[in-house]
A protein has these predicted regions:
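Amphipathic alpha-helical segments used for helix-helix packing
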Residues: 86, 101-122
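Short coil/turn segments at alpha/beta junctions that flank glycine-rich nucleotide-binding fingerprints
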Residues: 24-28, 105, 148
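Generic hydrophobic, amphipathic alpha-helix propensity
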Residues: 10-19, 35, 60, 64, ...
């Protein structure tokens, strides 16, 4: 039996649509068939790209992480901005995105963690990688701010925790 040729464009479309569906419907509310219908891919072809729904969602989380890096890194590489200005710009962008989604979509990783955090090992590892990625970048930015004098040194741990959880907290508040 000849295996169907894998198209990177189809895989990217599946990842994109899956990310949209997961953000809107959560893990358990997202059906593979609906995603395949939107992308116009036969159901049997899904397994040419992904071994399982868990592998698929873990790759979506990885893609989400890459998108976060693409947002974060250019902001932090602006040498003319202070660390505090960069943090303000970053959070303004995230809040604008949240408002543009009519407060219906928060952090994909936060939403998935609440729904399937401990039950899907591959997804849990991908989510932890995302969290570590954000925490590392925020810690670096805060340390830069402390060197510049725009962030007080004694606030380090408090600021790190608060900034990291601030966006997720807004999303959780929406759900309650």
């Amino acid at each position: 039996m000849v295996k169907a040729k894998r198209s990177s464009a189809v895989k990217e479309a599946l990842l994109y649509e899956g990310m949209q569906q997961l953000a809107e419907n959560g893990y358990h509310g997202t059906g593979i068939k609906k995603i395949l219908d939107v992308v116009n891919v036969p159901k049997g072809s899904f397994y040419n790209y992904f071994e399982s729904k868990e592998v698929y969602v873990a790759q979506i989380i990885h893609e989400y992480n890459q998108q976060s890096v693409q947002l974060f890194d250019p902001l932090t590489n602006k040498s003319e901005a202070t660390a505090m200005e960069t943090l303000e710009t970053l959070y303004k962008h995230m809040l604008d995105k949240y408002v543009a989604a009519e407060c219906q979509r928060g952090c994909l990783v936060g939403s998935l963690a609440a729904e399937v955090g401990h039950s899907l090992e591959l997804c849990q590892k991908a989510m932890q990688q995302n969290v570590t990625n954000w925490q590392t970048r925020l810690a670096s930015l805060i340390a830069q701010g402390q060197r510049e004098g725009s962030i007080r040194a004694e606030l380090y741990h408090y600021v790190c925790r608060t900034l990291f959880h601030r966006y997720g907290g807004a999303a959780a508040t929406k759900a309650s």
